[in-house]
Curated annotation (Swiss-Prot):
Chemical reaction(s) catalysed: GDP-alpha-D-mannose = GDP-4-dehydro-alpha-D-rhamnose + H2O
Keyword set, alphabetical order: Lyase, NADP
Species, as recorded: Vibrio cholerae serotype O1 (strain ATCC 39315 / El Tor Inaba N16961)
Binding annotation for NADP(+): 10-15, 65-66, 87-91, 102, 162, 188, 193
Protein known as: GDP-mannose 4,6-dehydratase
Length: 373
């Protein structure tokens, strides 16, 4: 039996690296597209890499870019994938306000380029296509919780670009018979999450503060409510969506909601820190109420370690996101296995280990840059 061949865009990111691991364990030959830069930026997949001169190499990287249609067509022609997972994107909401045109080129037109390459190469009957969509499509939410039929109301250039990608995926499915589907992903995290995303900013920042590398964590909207899951659970669902008889779009979520404030509190407790939130709005702060154990030697009772900086507010806020994963459970039998508490514990432990290493370097006179935007 021939191995299935998968092509992943965004393979060096959080989801791409977990998906690559998952598919390799299932016996796939996995190809990934990465952008060329002066740095390799492959740390999330380095453990999967093998010398291409060896026999039976099942993991291969290709230089490519979602803004280059000829490049994408060449890679697809060479790889002839059974499954394409489009996880590559400019995925930071705040950055999309600063670089809206680039975000549209990558996230919207990049998806079109992949679908058109599949059509142009005559792969419409061979290749299945998964599009990583986003809960940001719901934006100014029209109903709670959000499900597959909830109307979209995007509130950022990122979300608008992703809405085009969502509909062009459906259009190519209906127009050309491509097995193409959207996974509407709610927030999903892990120790591999980018350091500028809110959850990783929190766990990394709290660990750094605990070790004396930072004084205070500056945040935006503490009242924002999100549905957070673990990326490992979500990439399994992405794979399951391409194993069905017919393509269908699904919400991928936990169905449970927490505030940014609660995520901060949970992260602090993993370090033995009890916080008290005082003040309101831009004047809200988190004060250390007690410290237990040895994980936070640099912190004392009364320290202010979290504050609000209005610079981190979005031009158009998304106040609440809560997904309804009941269709995925009913049709595919998918349920998330990792709880938020387990995920927070894993993320804090990983960031604490790094912070302790940086603190040791600093103690011995080395310069350590731990700034978080």
């Amino acid at each position: 039996m021939n191995k299935k061949v998968a092509l992943i865009t965004g393979i060096t990111g959080q989801d791409g690296s977990y998906l690559a691991e998952f598919l390799l364990e299932k016996g796939y030959e996995v190809h990934g597209i990465k952008r060329r830069s002066s740095l390799f930026n492959t740390q999330r997949v380095d453990h999967l890499y093998k010398d291409p001169h060896e026999e039976d190499v099942n993991f291969k990287l290709h230089y490519g870019d979602l803004t280059d249609s000829s490049n994408l067509t060449r890679i697809l022609a060479e790889v002839q994938p059974d499954e394409v997972y489009n996880l590559g994107a400019q995925s930071h909401v705040a950055v999309s306000f600063q670089s809206p045109e680039y975000t549209a080129d990558v996230d919207a037109i990049g998806t079109l380029r992949l679908l058109e390459a599949i059509r142009f190469l005559g792969l419409t009957k061979k290749t299945k296509f998964y599009q990583a969509s986003t809960s940001e499509l719901y934006g100014l939410v029209q109903e709670i919780p959000q499900k597959e039929t909830t109307p979209f109301y995007p509130r950022s250039p990122y979300a608008v670009a992703k809405m085009y990608a969502y509909w062009i995926t459906i259009n190519y499915r209906e127009s050309y018979g491509i097995y193409a589907c959207n996974g509407i992903l709610f927030n999903h995290e892990s120790p591999r999450r980018g350091e500028t995303f809110v959850t990783r900013k929190i766990t990394r920042g709290m660990a750094n503060i605990a070790q004396g590398l930072e004084k205070c964590l500056f945040m935006g909207n503490l009242d924002a409510l999100r549905d957070w899951g673990h990326a490992k659970d979500y990439v399994k669902m992405q794979w399951m969506m391409l194993q069905q008889d017919e393509p269908r779009d699904f919400v991928i979520a936990t169905g449970v909601q927490y505030s940014v404030r609660e995520f901060i509190d949970m992260s602090a407790r993993e370090l033995g820190i009890e916080l008290e939130f005082v003040g309101k709005g831009v004047d809200e702060k988190a004060v250390v109420k007690s410290v237990i154990g040895t994980k936070a030697p640099a912190i004392k009772v009364g320290d202010i370690i979290v504050a609000v900086d209005p610079a981190y507010f979005r031009p158009a806020e998304v106040e609440t996101l809560l997904g309804d994963p009941s269709l995925a459970k009913k049709e595919l039998g998918w349920v998330p296995e990792i709880t938020l508490q387990q995920m927070v514990s894993e993320m804090v432990a990983s960031d604490l280990e790094q912070a302790q290493s940086h603190a040791l370097l600093k103690k011995h006179g080395y310069n350590v840059n731990v700034s978080v935007e």
